[in-house]
Amino acid sequence: DRVHPILHGLEVVDRRVLLLSIIGGFGTEDLARITGLHVDEVTHIIARVEPVVAAASRTGVLIIEDEPYMAELLSVLVEQTGHWVAGIAYTRDEAMTFAEKRDIGLILSDIDLGNDVCGWTVVHKIRETLGYRVPTIFITAHPERLEEDGCENRDGVVPKPFDIWRVREAVNNAVHLNASIFA
C-alpha cells in the first residue's frame, strides 16, 4: 500500500484532517466535529502538517531526455522555478532507476528518447512501478505523437523549440495543481 510522498510519514488522522481541510475546505470546528477530535487536537494537527504543505510546493523533478545539452538546460530551468532535480535520465533504464530510488513529484520527458523508445511508455511504466500518478509534462519536437498514440494523463505539453518562460510556467502549474490535490 504505497502512499504519495507528500503524505508519507503522516498518521492516518493527520492525513484525514489535512485532506478534509484542503480539499473539503472545512474549518477547525467542522474538522473537530467530523473527526470526533477536540478543537485543540485539530489545531495541533494542522500546525504539525503545515511543514508538509509547505514542502509540497517544492518538489523533485525527474528529467527524461536523451540529449545532454537539452537535459542540462531543463535542469537549470527546474532549479530556477525553486524545485530540485531528482535525476536526469538519458535512457529508459536510468529513468526507472531514479523513479525507484528518489521521491519524484514531477516528470519532464521527451517523447523520442532514441532507439525506438517512447517517453510516454517510460512514464507509464514509472507510474505503474510507483503505484501513483506522477504529474508529467512532455517537452517534445513531436507533440502530435501524443495525440496519435492516445497518450492521456499528461499535465502539459511544451513543443520544441520552446520558450523558457513556457517551461517554467508548465512546471509551476503542474506542481501547484498536484500540491493542491495532495497537500
PLM segments and residue spans:
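Short amphipathic alpha-helix used as the core "switch/output" element in two-component signaling
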Residues: 118-133
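Helix-turn-helix DNA-binding module
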Residues: 24-45, 49
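A short pre-motif secondary-structure segment
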Residues: 17-18
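Active-site residues of response regulator receiver
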Residues: 110-112
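Conserved acidic segment of CheY-like receiver
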Residues: 58-69, 74-78
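Acidic, metal-coordinating helix/loop segments flanking the phosphotransfer/catalytic sites
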Residues: 88-106, 147
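C-terminal output helix
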Residues: 30, 162-172
